[in-house]
Regions:
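Short beta-strand edge/turn micro-motifs at domain boundaries
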Residues: 133-168, 252-261, 285-322
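Short solvent-exposed beta->alpha transition segments
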Residues: 56-114, 200-227
Length: 324
């Protein structure tokens, strides 16, 4: 009996010593040598994506990844081919993970950026690289690379690409801006920010989730319905003698931000700059009076005038920029 009990205790101690809890090490806490190893692979990856070098991509990928190489890279390689992205990139976040079960669904919670990343680990050790690459200093794309340790080497098991942020703000941060606009009564500006936040919800396809996702979708759909119902176009500015017609409210993206664009048709020929400018003064007065749900204190407000021919087709346009 004593021998049996002793054997059970020894077995329990052995099993406990062999058991390893799942572990995730983030960013600067990761071993520097390992970070350098992965950095070299990421640099090679970006060079290969930029050049569409399938041989290098196959060398970096695992056997399973290479079986579906074309499908895996389909949504990743197009920003490089279209010139949106180059080899320039920086680490957004990175995680070294140790797992107890293979394969299994693993979850990482970002303490820095507030998202949850869920993926299937195909090895006892994985490394997740979240790499940011910018287009014209406006749009930030996220290239998410999941490496699995195969023997003594690290191989790509998964890769995705998506829009991470605009003007340095991700979905959660843009949503916060939308709520600020809404609280101030600027419903149209809130709507534009909600629409943008919605577009930023999948920087890594379905791998990354923000806790605000349901709220963003709910608030966008609610505001979209309200805008469509209450703020109709076209709208005739009847108090102005020339009767210009507001046709559309959209936005302009420049290097400093997203700003309102008010498009209208006018009976004044665009070549008559004096009359056109005088009419614009009246348009600004009427628009600011009737559209108080737009923030006209923004740095730029754009007005675009159109001429329409006898067949109702747009001939020419001219854009005015109001700088506050």
């Amino acid at each position: 009996m004593k021998k049996t009990l002793l054997l059970l205790l020894v077995l329990a101690a052995t099993l406990q010593s062999c058991y390893q809890k799942p572990e995730t090490i983030a960013n600067n806490d990761i071993d520097p040598k390992l970070r350098e190893t992965i950095k070299a692979k990421n640099d090679s990856l970006f060079e290969a994506l930029s050049d569409s070098n399938s041989k290098v991509l196959e060398k970096l990928g695992s056997e399973k990844f290479n079986k579906f190489l074309v499908a895996k890279l389909n949504g990743v390689i197009w920003p490089f081919r279209k010139g949106y992205l180059t080899t320039d990139h920086e680490v957004y976040e990175e995680f070294h993970n140790k797992h107890t079960t293979v394969p299994d669904n693993s979850t990482i919670n970002s303490a820095t950026n507030g998202y949850t990343l869920t993926f299937q680990n195909e090895a006892k050790e994985t490394y997740v690289s979240l790499l940011k690459s910018s287009y014209m200093g406006i749009d930030d794309y996220l290239i998410t690379v999941i490496y699995c340790k195969k023997g003594n080497d690290w191989k790509i098991e998964e890769i995705t690409a998506g829009l991470l942020s605009v003007y340095g703000k991700n979905a959660a941060q843009v949503y916060a801006q939308a709520k600020e606009y809404h609280e101030k009564g600027y419903e149209w500006d809130a709507y534009q920010q909600l629409n943008l936040a919605r577009q930023l919800l999948e920087p890594a396809q379905k791998l990354i989730k923000y806790p605000e996702e349901k709220e963003i979708i709910r608030d966008y759909e609610s505001m979209d319905k309200k805008i469509s119902t209450n703020y109709y176009m076209p709208y005739i500015l009847g108090n102005i003698d020339t009767k210009p017609i507001i046709q559309q409210l959209t936005v302009v993206k420049n290097t400093e931000g997203i700003f309102p664009l008010i498009s209208y048709t006018t009976q004044i020929r665009l070549s008559d700059s004096v009359s056109l400018s005088n009419e614009l003064k009246d348009i600004k007065t009427e628009v600011k009076k009737n559209y108080n749900w737009i923030n006209f204190k923004q740095k730029y407000i754009y007005y675009r005038a159109y001429n329409v021919n006898d067949n109702g087709l747009i001939e020419n346009s001219y854009t005015f920029t109001e700088k506050n």
